[in-house]
Each structure stands twice: as structure tokens, then as C-alpha cells.
Amino acid sequence: GVDAIGGLHVWALLPAGRLGCRQGPIMASADIWDIKIQGKGGHGAMPHNAIDPTITAATVISSLQTVVSREMDPQETVVLSVGKLEAGTAVNIIPDTARVAGNVRTTSRDVRARMEGIIRRVADGICAAMRCTAELTYTPIYPVTVNDPGATEVMRSAAVDVLGEENIVEVPVAMGSEDFSYFGEKVPAAYVFLGIADEEKGTNNQHHNPKFNVNDEVLPRGAALLAAFAMRMNGESCPHK
């Protein structure tokens, strides 16, 4: 069987060679939602003969923005973002459908379990009030990435040997998401961020940026860290840095 698992992500938010770690949630969950709003198309000159899904979509978007601020405990970490709005193809025609889509991220498993029902309630309620109907597709993608305290302490101890105590830093939760989280639901996990930022090398651009570049000089340290973690989990000593 597998006793524990370790992983790392290169991290442009930390200086090259630094290691970011924390116990508990370290990366958020990620779910995708898509709402199809059905109205009734018509001519823009005669809106009374149509049922406008575009206005309805705008109202749904505005209402969704109050979910985090009005329904969530302020101490919870939740992000609800709208990433797509589609409606119509002509400037003088009221379309019959509109589509609103986005994503939800949180570090709470309980909050995550509630979000589909909340979004459905908002979409159905707004659409009913504005004579439209809503069809929600909600797709869970990645769970919360949670670091086991014991495994994380082993990883930190290995990092002290490989990178030095001065290069270990505590990091806040990142609201990005990671499929490594699935492993953490099965066995104790330790996931860390390996800094790559070096302005002179051009490796300080944000992730998913066209100018993002990996600092290759740091990668061997990451490999050494994972090897040291595995050795410590097996009760073996690892070479000093």
C-alpha cells in the first residue's frame, strides 16, 4: 500500500529556491457551472412580444455576485466568478436564449457541497420572476488540496536538509486548483510550492501568462526534495544539502 504522497508545483510567486508549505488546505477546489436561459426571441423594436433572456442573464449575474458577500461566512474562502456570457447574433434582435457560465472555488468541503444548490436556486428564482426558464449544468472538477499535518511535517523536515531552514516559508492558501487533490483524498498528502522567480532569468512572470517560463536551475532541487521526502517516509536518512 501507499503510506503517503508528496508533490510540488513550481511557483512564480516565490523567489527561486524558496519553498512554500502549509498544513491543511493549500489549494482550492474548482467546479464549473453553466446556465442556459430560455426566453422568447423577437424584434428589438417590439420587446413586449418577446421574453428577453439577455436582461435575465444580466440579473442572474448580478445576483450571483451577492452569494459570497451575503450568504457565506466571511471567514470562509470562496470565489464565484462569471467567465462567459453569450446571447444573440444581431443588434436588432432579442435572442431566444442566453448562456452564463463560470467557476466556483473554495477551501471548504462543506461550502463546496452547498454551491450547486445555491446557484440553482438563484438561477431558477430570477428566471421565474422574469418569465424565463433556467437549465443548470454543474460539473465538479477538483477537490480541495489538503495537506496532512504529519506528511507535511516530514516534507518540511526534508526541505530543511535539502534547501536550508532559511528557504522555508509559510504560504497562504492559493485559490488555484490541482488534480493532485485526488491523491490527498486517498492517502496523507504533502504538496508544496517551489519558487522559480528570478527577474534576471525572466522566470518571474505569473502562471498561465504568455511570458511564463520555468527556471530550470531550480528543478534539480525539487527532485532532490521529493527523493528526500520518500526516504524519510521510509525511515531512511537523506544526504545533507
Predicted regions and their residues:
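Metal-dependent amide/peptide-bond hydrolase catalytic core
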Residues: 54-241
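Histidine/acidic-residue-rich, glycine-tolerant segments that coordinate divalent metal ions
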Residues: 1-95, 177-178
